[in-house]
Amino acid sequence: MKKSILIEINEIIEEFSFFDDWADRYQHLIDLGRKLPVIPTEYQKDEYKLTGCQSTVFFVADKTDENMIEFRAQSDAAIVQGLIALILRVYSGRTSNDILNTSPDFLKQIGLDTHLSPTRKNGLGAMTVSYTHLRAHETKR
């Protein structure tokens, strides 16, 4: 059974609190991204590409038979791939209501809001808008 969103968020905050400096936190983020599976080539097309990201990001959402929203995404940039890993860990496999009612504030709590470049912040914002938009319209892609 999947952990609750609150447990996932608290575990992420705790994981990042173990690191004393941002070099170690970035390395952890990169390591998380490396563990993500590659999305199928059928989704590596312009129609699934996020706008607003400097790096290439493909983002897909599917609604399961159990009314859960499954997200898949990948980037060609290591840190962005790590950000994707965090987003998917919290939001993928959740109901629309869970997604809507869960703010991405945990990213601020681990300090990402002050340690990302402006272009990465824009990309993170684009991902946040995308999963919220897809959830709101309950799109099956």
Regions found by a protein language model. Give the residues of each.
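N-terminal intrinsically disordered, cationic/polar leader segments
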Residues: K2-I5, I9, F19-Q27, D31-Q54, ...
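Solvent-exposed interaction patches of small proteins and small membrane subunits
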Residues: E47-C53, F71-S75, N97-I99
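A glycine-rich, hydrophobic loop/mini-helix early in the fold
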Residues: F58
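Conserved interaction-surface patches within small, structured recognition/assembly domains
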Residues: D62-A77, L88-S92
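Primarily the active-site beta-strand->alpha-helix module of PP2C/PPM metal-dependent phosphatases
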Residues: I84
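Glycine-rich phosphate/pyrophosphate-binding loops
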Residues: G93-I110
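Long, amphipathic alpha-helical surface segments
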Residues: L124-L134
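Single conserved hydrophobic/aromatic residue that forms the stacking wall/gate
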Residues: H133-R141
